Structure formats: structure tokens, C-alpha cells
């Protein structure tokens, strides 16, 4: 749950890990497992969390306002990984009811619905400790040559047997990463890989700044792709 100090830091713009407090996070409250939802909606008269766990009914789980902070929160027991959700917001300006995506969502549906998915990011264990420890010494761009391979993951290679679908993160780790290393590059620069609604775009219309696009797999598969890059001594740059 958000503390008064969290809200103070958020209000002054210094809650640097706000993504750990806002969004959807699995918690336990009074012995009940569930998910804590929090969203900043300063001009809302009312906010509810809606999802497939309550029939998308805004009357079921209204959120409580945390005063002048503009933050709303709710704890919903029984919600778990895989449940989809949005926020329904009633404006205090004109009374309009709007369904909004979670700006702190970490995983989204692959269609353009904008629904986020509750997901535990701790299910993956990073394997790049050695790379991270040596990065300042071995990967400094100021004192050594840098050669970057810029790529759009969705169009690098297609799979005819799957109707022309792009490679998954795991497949890219097996095919793209060794290719880039073999070609002598030091870095991979990914054209926008954060969640966006239109698959035919380059990805600059971002709706989820904390979520790698689900078009190529879940968040842990993206982490595995990054791990593969680091295992091949390749730095990663996000466009």
C-alpha cells in the first residue's frame, strides 16, 4: 500500500520507483492474497478497477481516493496472474465515464483493447550478473569504438509456417543475437519495443512505458532476450 511518505515523494516528483507503488501488484492483506491497484487520476470524481474477475462491472470494486495526491487505490482479493483489467474513471468536470489503460501496466493484451494483465515480474531470474558487473569497464562508449545494429523486431524475420508471424523473443534470442554478434556489432538498438496499439507502426505510439510489447511473448521472454544479448557481449539500446 502507499504510505504518506510515498505520496509526498510522488507529489514532489521524487518517487523515482513509482512503478513499484502504482499499477497492479500482488499483495497479502489481513491474510488474504490479492492485488493492490493504484492509479493517479487527479480530476476524477470516482474510479473503479474493472476486469474479467468482476465482469467488468465498475460497481464491484470502487477505489478510494488518497486525498490531494490524486492517487486512487483498491485491494482486490483473489486476483492473480493472467487476470485482465482497466480503470473506469468518472470525470468530475463533465461526469463522463471513461475506460482507461493502466499507465503502469507491465503486460498488455496483444490486441488493441488496451487491457493490462496482472503479472508477476519476479518469475524470471536474471542471468547477466557478470555482464552488469563488468559493464562500466567493458562497455564504456566514451573510450572505445561502438557499432550499433538498429532493428525492428517485428520485421527482422517472419515465419511462413505461422502465416508470416514475426519471431518470438525466445526465437530472436536464438537467431538474431548470434547473427548480430557474428557481424561484429557491439550493441543492438531496438526500434520501439514498448507496448503500442497498432502493429503496422514502428511502435512510437506507446501506451505502456513499463511493458515490452506482448506481440513477441510475455515479459519474462523479453528478459531472456536481453540476457542472451548480454551473454553474447552485446549492449542493448532502446529507441
Protein language model annotation of sequence segments:
Residues 159, 164-167, 178-224, 234:
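Aromatic-lined carbohydrate-binding/catalytic grooves of carbohydrate-active enzymes
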Residues 1-32, 36, 66-150, 155-164, ...:
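The feature marks proteins involved in alpha-glucan
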Residues 40-47, 56:
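Short proline/glycine-enriched turn/loop motifs at strand-loop junctions of beta-rich domains
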Residues 135-138, 173-184, 226:
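Short amphipathic alpha-helices and their capping/turn segments at secondary-structure boundaries
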Residues 47-49, 85:
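Short beta-strand elements bearing conserved aromatic residues within extracellular beta-rich modules
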Residues 147-151, 188-190, 236-238:
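Hydrophobic faces of well-ordered beta-strands that scaffold small-molecule active sites
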Residues 59-67:
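Short, surface-exposed loop motifs enriched in S/T, G, D/E and P with embedded aromatic residues
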Amino acid at each position: 500500500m502507499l504510505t504518506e511518505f510515498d505520496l509526498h515523494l510522488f507529489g514532489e516528483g521524487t518517487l523515482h520507483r513509482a512503478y513499484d507503488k502504482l499499477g497492479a501488484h500482488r499483495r497479502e492483506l489481513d491474510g488474504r492474497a490479492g492485488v493492490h491497484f493504484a492509479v493517479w487520476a487527479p480530476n476524477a470524481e470516482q474510479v473503479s478497477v474493472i476486469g474479467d474477475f468482476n465482469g467488468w462491472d465498475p460497481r464491484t470494486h470502487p477505489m478510494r481516493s488518497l486525498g490531494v495526491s490524486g492517487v486512487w487505490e483498491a485491494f482486490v482479493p483473489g486476483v492473480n496472474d493472467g487476470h485482465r483489467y482497466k480503470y473506469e474513471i468518472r470525470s468530475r468536470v463533465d461526469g463522463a465515464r471513461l475506460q482507461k489503460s493502466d499507465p503502469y501496466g507491465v503486460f498488455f493484451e496483444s490486441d488493441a483493447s488496451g487491457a493490462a494483465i496482472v503479472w508477476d515480474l519476479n518469475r524470471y531470474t536474471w542471468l547477466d550478473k557478470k555482464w552488469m558487473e563488468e559493464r562500466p569497464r567493458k562497455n564504456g562508449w566514451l573510450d572505445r569504438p561502438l557499432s550499433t545494429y538498429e532493428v525492428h523486431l517485428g520485421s527482422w524475420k517472419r515465419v511462413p509456417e505461422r502465416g508470416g508471424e514475426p519471431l518470438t523473443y525466445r526465437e530472436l534470442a536464438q537467431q538474431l543475437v548470434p547473427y548480430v554478434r557474428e557481424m561484429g556489432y557491439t550493441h543492438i538498438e531496438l526500434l520501439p519495443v514498448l507496448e503500442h496499439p497498432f502493429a503496422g507502426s514502428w511502435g512510437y505510439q506507446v501506451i505502456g512505458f513499463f511493458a515490452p510489447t506482448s506481440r513477441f511473448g510475455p515479459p519474462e521472454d523479453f528478459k531472456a532476450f536481453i540476457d542472451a544479448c548480454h551473454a553474447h557481449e552485446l549492449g542493448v539500446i532502446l529507441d
